[in-house]
Amino acid sequence: MRPIAKFTNGLTTLPSGLKFALGLLFFMALSFIQSEAAEGQLGGCPCGCSGGCRFSGAGTSDEIDSRIGSRWNFTATDGATTGAGDAVTLTWGIAAEGSPIGDAFGANTGPEGSSFVDFLDNATARDPNSTGGADLTQRDWFSLFEDSANRISQVSGVTFNFESNDDGAPLFSAPAGGGLLAGPAGALGTRADIRIGGRSVDGQTGGNVLAFAFPANIGETVFDTDNVNFFSSTFNDSVGFRNVLTHELFHALGISHVDSAGGASFLLNPTINTSFDGPQLDDILVLQRNYGDFLESSNDQLGNNSIATATVLGLLSDDNSLSAGQEVDDTVIGFDEVGFVSINDATDVDVFEFSLSELSEVSIDLSPEGASYLQGVENGTLEEIDTLELNDLALQLFDSDGNLIAAADDFGLGLSESILQTLDAGTFFVEVSGSSDEIQLFTLGLSSSVVAVPEPGSVMIVVGMFGFLQVRRRRN
């Protein structure tokens, strides 16, 4: 069996993957590697060439789609799931100490029992009093796992729940005949969908493997417990450990590596980077393409695709504007940035509800969000993708009975749409849609100003004067 990683020119690169045997099906195993470059820096040209990288013309979300190898179609919580762009609920857990882990790298070391909890207690625990005991949630390092899982849920339709039970079943085995054999599927109260363990892999000197994971519907994730020096760093709240973990969870969700250049760096780059914290723009796009935005997990995973399940924005007034989405003007995304929403394709709609307490002039503005950068599949050709111009968005306004009041679809890719409408008190709905099979991040903003209504006495005076003038005209 071919190793999952190989080293060239002092840097670590990955082949296309390793064979994973499951009946007659083969899956790609994905690994995360550490460069010999300084912490926080990428090692070498992201596309793997020593000189200039090969670039070509403008890309579309085909470049995003090409990195989605699979998605979870059955989970312990949901049972059978639906299609791309829809939300899922997954359990994650720590494999019981001693759970067998096969030799994925052909080092002829044979299976080894997981020693991940012991490794975490000794390498990553920042409070020595937090170790020990059966309740892993009391460990000091447990918050690192929660932070990574919660961050994915904040920026996508994936809901992660911790499964505290684990029966010690093998994560995977490596039969003598070759290939790798998956362990059992997740089961509530027994084991998680995504089980995380650790064993010795290839040491911690030079370019080496930090962790690897199997794709969706398998999801087993293994950390190299040799890498004590790297994982013991508490720099920026252990960002190195958290970025590796979040990266591997992306693989467990069916998403593969991305190469990038021109100043754009992403969590799914093949080499570790601690200069940012968590998923970046391209990571969020590919994750939402596969599982939708966080609003898709609302209403028991029905999302906000109809008036009946609309996202309630609240009362719109002079001193209370409303909004949805997060502005994007760069590939860099801060760990505290939340609220990213998107239209997934031509069949996806997002519906938002707002209300008015008095006659008002309402302004509704819809803007696509994104940035331009170079990216491509690992070791492939890099293409420029402008994520501001992936899908042409449209805007519609409905009353409480679902009757269309106004619509805006006047401009093209990358341009905003707006509606200006005088509305009486009541409840209204805004629908956002797209025209093509592309993902598009967007922001929606609503503002209003009260329309002054004349006092009854003033109206009577005006009407009286008008009647007097009419009489005078008749007499003339």
Task: State where each predicted segment sits.
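Non-catalytic, beta-strand-enriched accessory regions in extracellular/secretory proteins
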Residues: 322-363, 371-378, 414-419, 427-429
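Metalloprotease/metallohydrolase-associated module, dominated by Zn2+-dependent proteases
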Residues: 220, 225-226, 230, 256-344
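Metzincin-family zinc-dependent endopeptidase catalytic domain
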Residues: 45-87, 94-99, 129-135, 139-260, ...
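Bacterial N-terminal signal peptides
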Residues: 19-31
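A short, hydrophobic C-terminal helix/tail in secreted or cell-surface proteins
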Residues: 454-472
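C-terminal edge strands of extracellular/lumenal beta-sandwich accessory domains
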Residues: 280-317, 350-352, 373-403, 418-452
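Extracellular beta-strand-rich recognition modules
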Residues: 223, 362-366, 428-434
